[in-house]
From Swiss-Prot:
Keywords: Antiport, ATP-binding, CBS domain, Chloride, Ion transport, Lysosome, Membrane, Nucleotide-binding, Phosphoprotein, Repeat, Transmembrane, Transmembrane helix, Transport. A motif (Selectivity filter part_1) lies at residues 201-205. ATP binds at H656, N657, G658, T781, R782, K783, D784. The gene is Clcn7. Brain, testis, muscle and kidney. This is H(+)/Cl(-) exchange transporter 7. GO terms for molecular function: ATP binding; chloride transmembrane transporter activity; chloride:proton antiporter activity. It comes from Rattus norvegicus.
């Protein structure tokens, strides 16, 4: 522990020497004492009010599975919320990615014959096909609505600008532009801030956390999908520096989570299909497929979608899952391609593989030479530095928002302010620019003439007066001479800060396209410089360097290498640039990691989520399970009184949602581990009143099936909603049939990296720590492991907080 820099000590182990373990008194009979074996030592017991304390914290904010959201007390909003990035929130619960192999589960698995097994496998493939189809259709809907609304907006503004350019009074055009932008963003931010805040942003950090095993409330609900789709349409049409591609990953994940369950808890509709997949383990795999399908629909990159899900999302992987994810990705991009081709009148052409099509790069005209490799590496360095600056600025901006802009009304006002400022800055730059280019050969959809001569257009408007996707394609493919260096330099500088300010607003939006647009702008500027230095050599094409700059900037911000390389290759339909794109992305990641972590990881950290990386901190071998585990542990007996179980579940201090089950022995003998049972299982048992009247009787006649637990999943009722009479409190509950009789355990002397590897690789929620006699001495949960991380000064232990 010498190398551990402790910030605040919250672990219950620090109080072991200070507190004794008082007795738990039986509810309703104060003169009797009922032993509640806590496993902290031979015969150890503790009071009901002190069960499972985490340090000195007595109150823990419960997740939505514990509290009824309809009866939660109203939130109050202080003027400032103190926030420290060295915190780990207790409000997040873990998902059960390890199946509880109790008697019910094993009996069902034994009944599955070869035919039933094949049926389950076929259902998996059918679900993946449905995920791909629906994700593709949602992407089509977003694209068509954005194209029509944005086209209408830009036509109205263009006509207004053309009108007032001749007669004067362009300030009215500015007012119209800012008003239209603010109106769209107002609606988009209101529905996010007041209806479903988890729909804000791209959703990629939240999906990463879900696949990592963290339960993010409402992240894969139908309402979230509706708000996400509506919000991203309004954000893009509102002219913000955002893209619609990132949120497709979140949308695909929500679709996958819903389809795989065969019901909608939001709509209270159960279609009685796919019931076998109603558990976290199965849902996780389908959400991985949904994330990949979202990438595939966004960029027309099915292989890139699979690699994105592997690199950024899925924490657990196997060969069969790879095939199903690839299948969902291919179906998604084909559905999008087919529907958009019909919409554009080219039914048999299939020319729209993704929401954004970078266009084909001519390999012969734009081939690279060996002496350009150092130039590409230099561009990667620039992208890494600019990405680090972007992330650092966004970090401090997000900290400011957490502390001061936490009221929904303030969040809406900020979003409208950013929309108005974006329109104003764009108008001022377009108005001030005298960069006029010939209209002939231009790909601009809404060319603005302003003060240019007839037959010319303002090139600054080509970057600002368009959707970001079309602006990226223009920078890639417009012929040399379409932009002058001053225009590109000003656009890069201004759009960089606008995109940084915009990311983190309470709107549904992504950072993929803004990053590509910034990089394409300074990359094209880089290409113009190379062309000037080499005397307009044929290989110094600005479009090629715009592509490399876009890859460098995006890689410097999000720090993805493998998946981004393939996505860029598939989106450009050109394998030639695979090697230079990989070099650029790797260089950008290496350089950026020197200064600050990637944008998604940074926001996960700012939200204090107990996210587990692939490996434990490299300097953590000096720590053992004894030092990181939570103690004392609330244990239950095989045959436990209903009143005790109700009291344990009602006690907010015992909020680990899992309880070791120990053998029922005499008070003087040690309690050995027999199994583990989850809070959700106990809730279902109490709801169905699986009691016996006297402790010497067997189970009641009514036998629970695994279906009863699946029907309650995933929104288990809160303990407060289950009525247990005084007579029922005196009954006994036999946990033998429902507990997991073979939970994973580790000895006290196991090192932290070994505990971490076991916990992380198996997707555990609880890991029981036992002594040499198999007595429970502690419990390791996700938060116990996540609070150790490698800081600049060595190994740090994060503080635990309620929010």
């Amino acid at each position: 522990m010498a190398n551990v820099s402790k910030k605040v000590s919250w672990s219950g182990r620090d109080r072991d020497d200070e507190e004794g373990a008082p007795l738990l008194r039986r509810t309703g009979q104060p003169d009797e004492e009922t032993p509640l074996l806590n496993g902290a030592g031979p015969g150890a017991r503790q009071s009901h009010s002190a069960l499972f304390r985490i340090g000195q914290m007595n109150n823990v904010e419960l997740d939505d599975e514990l509290l009824d959201p309809e009866v939660d007390p109203p939130h109050t909003f202080p003027k400032e919320i103190p926030h420290n990035e060295k915190l780990l929130s207790l409000k997040y619960e873990s998902l059960d990615y390890d199946n509880s192999e109790n008697q019910l589960f094993l009996e069902e698995e034994r009944r599955i014959n070869h035919t039933a097994f094949r049926t389950v496998e076929i259902k998996r493939w059918v679900i993946c096909a449905l995920i791909g189809i629906l994700t593709g259709l949602v992407a089509c809907f977003i694209d068509i609505v954005v194209e029509n609304l944005a086209g209408l907006k830009y036509r109205v503004i263009k006509d207004n600008i053309d009108k007032f350019t001749e007669k004067g009074g362009l300030s009215f055009s500015l007012l119209l532009w800012a008003t239209l932008n603010s109106a769209f963003v107002l609606v988009g931010s209101v529905i996010v801030a007041f209806i479903e805040p988890v729909a804000a942003g791209s959703g990629i950090p939240q999906i990463k956390c879900f696949l990592n095993g963290v339960k993010i409330p409402h992240v894969v609900r139908l309402k979230t999908l509706v708000i996400k789709v509506s919000g991203v349409i309004l954000s893009v049409v509102g002219g913000l520096a955002v893209g619609k591609e990132g949120p497709m990953i979140h949308s695909g994940s929500v679709i996958a989570a819903g389809i795989s369950q065969g019901r909608s808890t939001s709509l209270k509709r159960d279609f009685k299909i796919f019931e076998y997949f109603r558990r976290d383990t199965e849902k996780r795999d389908f959400v991985s497929a949904g994330a990949a399908a979202g990438v595939s629909a966004a960029f027309g990159a099915p292989v890139g979608g699979v690699l994105f899900s592997l690199e950024e999302g899925a924490s657990f992987w196997n060969q069969f899952l790879t095939w199903r994810i690839f299948f969902a990705s291919m179906i998604s991009t084909f559905t999008l391609n087919f529907v958009l081709s019909i919409y554009h009148g080219n039914m048999w052409d299939l020319s729209s593989p993704g929401l954004i099509n970078f266009g084909r790069f001519d390999s012969e005209k734009m081939a690279y030479t060996i002496h350009e490799i150092p130039v590409f590496i230099a561009m990667g360095v620039v992208g890494g530095i600019l990405g680090a600056v972007f992330n650092a600025l966004n970090y401090w901006l997000t900290m400011f928002r957490i502390r001061y802009i936490h009221r929904p009304c303030l969040q809406v006002i900020e979003a409208m302010l950013v929309a108005a400022v974006t329109a104003t800055v764009a108008f001022v730059l377009i108005y001030s620019s005298r960069d006029c280019q010939p209209l002939q050969g231009s790909s601009m959809s809404y060319p603005l003439q302003l003060f240019c001569a007839d037959g010319e257009y303002n090139s600054m408007a080509a970057a600002f007066f368009n959707t970001p996707e079309k602006s990226v394609v223009s920078l890639f493919h417009d012929p040399p001479g379409s932009y002058n260096p001053m225009t590109l330099g000003l656009f890069t500088l201004v759009y960089f800060f606008l995109a940084c300010w915009t990311y983190g607003l309470t709107v549904s939006a992504g950072v993929f396209i803004p990053s590509l647009l910034i990089g394409a702008a300074w990359g094209r500027l880089f290409g113009i410089s190379m062309s000037y230095l080499t005397g307009a050599a044929i290989w110094a094409d600005p479009g090629k360097y715009a592509l490399m700059g876009a890859a460098a900037q995006l890689g410097g911000i999000v720090r993805m290498t493998l998946s981004l390389t393939v996505i860029m290759m598939e989106a450009t339909s050109n394998v030639t640039y695979g090697f230079p794109i990989m070099l650029v992305l790797m260089t950008a990641k290496i350089v950026g990691d020197v200064f600050i972590e990637g944008l998604y990881d940074m926001h996960i950290q700012l939200q204090s989520v107990p996210f587990l990386h692939w490996e434990a901190p490299v300097t953590s071998h000096s720590l053992t399970a004894r030092e990181v585990m939570s103690t004392p542990v609330t244990c239950l007996r095989r045959r436990e009184k209903v009143g005790i179980i109700v009291d344990v579940l009602s006690d907010t201090a015992s909020n680990h949602n899992g309880f070791p089950v120990v053998e029922d022995v005499g008070d003087t003998q040690p309690a050995r581990l027999q199994g583990l049972i989850l809070r959700s299982q106990l809730i279902v048992l109490l709801k169905h009143k699986v009691f016996v009247e006297r402790s010497n009787m067997g189970l009641v006649q009514r036998r629970l099936r695994l279906k009863d637990f699946r029907d309650a999943y995933p929104r288990f009722p809160p303990i407060q909603s289950i009525h247990v009479s005084q007579d029922e409190r005196e009954c006994t509950m036999d946990l033998s049939e429902f507990m997991n009789p073979s939970p994973y355990t580790v000895p006290q002397e196991a090192s932290l990296p070994r505990v971490f590897k076991l916990f992380r690789a198996l997707g555990l929620r609880h890991l029981v720590v036992v002594d040499n006699h198999n007595q429970v001495v502690g419990l390791v949960t996700r938060k116990d492991l996540a609070r150790y991380r490698l800081g600049k000064g060595g190994l740090e232990e994060l503080s635990l907080a309620q929010t």
